Amino acid sequence: MRECISVHIGQAGVQMGNACWELYCLEHGIQPDGQMPSDKTIGGGDDSFNTFFSETGAGKHVPRAVFVDLEPTVVDEVRTGTYRQLFHPEQLITGKEDAANNYARGHYTVGKEIIDLVLDRIRKLADQCTGLQGFLIFHSFGGGTGSGFSSLLMERLSVDYGKKSKLEFAIYPAPQISTAVVEPYNSILTTHTTLEHSDCAFMVDNEAIYDICRRNLDIERPTYTNLNRLIGQIVSSITASLRFDGALNVDLTEFQTNLVPYPRIHFPLATYAPVISAEKAYHEQLTVAEITNACFEPANQMVKCDPRHGKYMSCCMLYRGDVVPKDVNAAIATIKTKRTIQFVDWCPTGFKVGINYQPPTVVPGGDLAKVQRAVCMLSNTTAIAEAWARLDHKFDLMYAKRAFVHWYVGEGMEEGEFSEAREDLAALEKDYEEVGVDSVEGEGEEEGGEEY
């Protein structure tokens, strides 16, 4: 088996975890107490879901997951919620005091007291796996626990599990709305620390998701539950290939192989379609061509940036439901002829396609309509550099005045770490810029240089 262990860190990570596991349970017919009624052998007893669930002797299915937060309130909601019987109490780990939106507390002072306990629990989960594939790490960039503790954990996982893949699902600070003033500091510090430890990071920006909820689902004031359920659908699409048998199956390492051209350029953009409310879906027939086109609308992306200003390096289309390769090929051919999308010249239009016959599941009473087919597009585009540029700019404004820096230094960080992290991100922006430059021009310039 190719098992995956999910680690949910901090408030954002834990709440995304709730949405994801709720959805996984629905998709696999697992009840909130972990039992799987035997009459529900959908698809003739496919056991691929064991990549995400382990089965106990009593026939109970337990998620291969750990929830960690430095303060107890959010995880307490899991302990008392609908799915309290699903998790083993040891999988829910909480500290006493929170990281107070401070990367240094999450990474150094408070984080280091709990890290060994967390690694011990992860080791127990890993021991139950026959062939551990890697880790999915859910966290936010802006919070203290999400930024500081995640980067600490990833450093330690690299030491303990060397070559195992580590994929991140990270909540990127929204351009307009902010949950903490120091978000830019935390984001840049955590990106710098995890850059070499993460194999692939799917970023999700709250504001982009707010807009999708408002525009496509007509929710006036989206709550975190609305946002997380939408994120859950995306995570589910990305992991569906690991949990179900399909025609074209994709495993974790296969994503990286196809999406990450250079180790540092590992921030694919996720787009999901159709995001549509039940009353609208009733009147529309969403064809493969339509949902494929919708993926190339910047409005449906999970991060605010404009791919029309960037170039694509690679593109994965993950379809699920009633989809046949013929329709997919036709839809992609149409998109290629429109040429609104530009690929870098060193990568001839590479679309990787995965099809999973399990139709998308929706949470009963949720906002999303039940549809016959859906698609999640993962594209590695140079446009995401816009997101880094925005963040770097905010960092610079604050750091120029050394605002709030004393909180970090007081927790044992050195000021040098700030400038080091900022330089690393400047380099990352530069990397993205260079990847998008046409290779032929570059050679011409070098030859010109030799003549003088």
UniProtKB/Swiss-Prot annotation:
Predominant cellular place of this UniProt entry's protein: cytoplasm
Region listing for Disordered, in residue ranges: 432-452
Domain of life: Eukaryota
PROSITE patterns documented for this protein: TUBULIN
Chemical reaction(s) catalysed: GTP + H2O = GDP + phosphate + H(+)
Enzyme class, broadest EC rank: hydrolase
GO molecular function: GTP binding; hydrolase activity; metal ion binding; structural constituent of cytoskeleton
Record localization: Cytoplasm, Cytoskeleton
PTM-bearing positions, type N6-acetyllysine: K40
Binding site for Mg(2+): E71
PANTHER family in the record: TUBULIN
Quaternary state and interactors: Dimer of alpha and beta chains. A typical microtubule is a hollow water-filled tube with an outer diameter of 25 nm and an inner diameter of 15 nM. Alpha-beta heterodimers associate head-to-tail to form protofilaments running lengthwise along the microtubule wall with the beta-tubulin subunit facing the microtubule plus end conferring a structural polarity. Microtubules usually have 13 protofilaments but different protofilament numbers can be found in some organisms and specialized cells.
Identification of the protein by name: Tubulin alpha-2/alpha-4 chain
